[in-house]
Regions:
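Short, ordered loop/turn segments at secondary-structure junctions
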Residues: 41, 59, 83-85
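N-terminal glycine-rich "phosphate-gripper" loop used for MgATP/nucleotide binding
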Residues: 56-65
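Ser/Thr/Gly-rich flexible loops in soluble cytosolic domains mediating phosphotransfer, phosphorylation
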Residues: 77-102
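Conserved active-site segments centered on acidic
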Residues: 2-41
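Short acidic/histidine-rich motifs immediately flanking catalytic phosphotransfer sites
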Residues: 48-53
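Short, well-ordered alpha-helices that flank and scaffold nucleotide-derived cofactor binding pockets
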Residues: 21, 25, 29, 69, ...
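Generic structural signal for helix capping and beta-alpha/helix-loop junctions
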Residues: 44-46, 88
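P-loop/Walker A phosphate-binding loop and immediately adjacent motor/lid segment at beta-alpha junctions
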Residues: 4-5, 9-13, 24, 64-86
């Protein structure tokens, strides 16, 4: 599998930062090459050209249409993270969800 570049977003980047750290740990255990950044939702546009996937906090479901507009024709997979793993910061479950797309 090629190196994946992933952006996680939440409201301010704090909770997505913890989740990104846990996904990094889960990926390292599997020897997967994944570059994960966590940012606030206001920064999405700045990263569209650099990422393969965008993982969105479940509380931001209301901006999915806006995100699709940002992405346009870019080849970026958008995943709405599930509350079941987001609320517990379960990096293994989040990684599984991500890998299903690739």
């Amino acid at each position: 599998m090629k190196k994946l570049n992933v952006l996680l977003v939440c409201g301010s980047g704090a909770s997505s930062g913890f989740m990104a750290s846990n996904i990094r740990k889960a990926a390292a255990k599997r020897n997967l090459d994944i570059n994960i950044k966590a940012r606030g939702e206001a920064e999405i546009e700045n990263y569209i050209d650099e990422i393969d996937a965008l993982m969105v906090g479940p509380h931001l479901a209301y901006i999915l249409d806006e995100i699709e507009d940002y992405i346009g024709e870019a080849d970026v997979k958008v995943l709405l993270m599930k509350p079941s793993y987001y609320s517990t910061l379960d990096g293994d479950a989040a990684l599984e969800d991500l890998l299903k797309e690739f």
